[in-house]
Amino acid sequence: MRIPAHAVCTAIRDDIVTGVFQPGARLTEELLARRYGVSRVPVREALRTLESEGFVTTRRHAGACVAEPTQQEAADLLELRMLVEPLAAARAARRRTDAHLKVLRGLVRLGQERARQGQGEDLRALGGWFHETLSQASGSPGLISLLTQLRHKVAWMYAVQAPARPAESWAEHGAIVDAVARGDAERARALTAAHAERAGEAHRMRLRSGGPVRTSQPAVNMSSGLH
């Protein structure tokens, strides 16, 4: 059975995001085909997609390599996500379905439970699912696509961690869901913007304490994204 290029693309992207392939690393079709058990055709298609997304660059005489983001690109990326996510929340308040609301509330319950138990690994995944579902609830394909790509890139460029105060973070998630459930677009926007700003401030504090971003430059002080 032929494995589709989008599945290979997801696998390569995941390996880039998690640091299996470091910035600047060569990505040969032969190596990737062997790693994922596929032919070189879907690998070639996947690399083209990842290049269009900014995860891969093509170098003369070297071929495809993992991109090497600059400090400014990493900072701009986080700021862009902080601007776009409140818009998605406002649209979610107007367009969400009962199914979206059920999933969001379920994630908040799980997140609050895991926060009490101190299960950081689970919280990272749950936070990602929460923000993914919130963007899906916006009903805006362009926003959904943009935020999905931004989340991938934030996770790639920054050493994404669970929030320092998980109970507070998940209380904020719960308040956002309440606003979405009531159809209060402006409150959903404001709460999401405040949530993003607090996450951004926590990020800036970690910048000063020295967590590295995945770039080709040494000693870059950057760390996590939004939660």
Regions found by a protein language model. Give the residues of each.
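Generic alpha-helical segment signature
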Residues: 1, 5, 81, 97-100, ...
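Short linear motifs at protein or domain termini
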Residues: 1-90, 94, 204-227
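A short secondary-structure junction motif
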Residues: 15, 19, 141, 150-157, ...
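Residue-level recognition of short, well-ordered coil/turn positions
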Residues: 20, 55, 119, 184-185
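C-terminal regulatory/effector modules of DNA-binding transcriptional regulators
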Residues: 35, 163-227
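Mobile beta-alpha loop/short-helix "lid" or hinge segments that flank ligand
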Residues: 51-57, 152, 164-167
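Conserved amphipathic alpha-helical segments that form helical-bundle/coiled-coil interaction surfaces
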Residues: 77, 98-159, 170-179, 187-197
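Short helix-capping/hinge motifs at transmembrane helix termini and TM-loop junctions
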Residues: 93-94, 139, 162-163
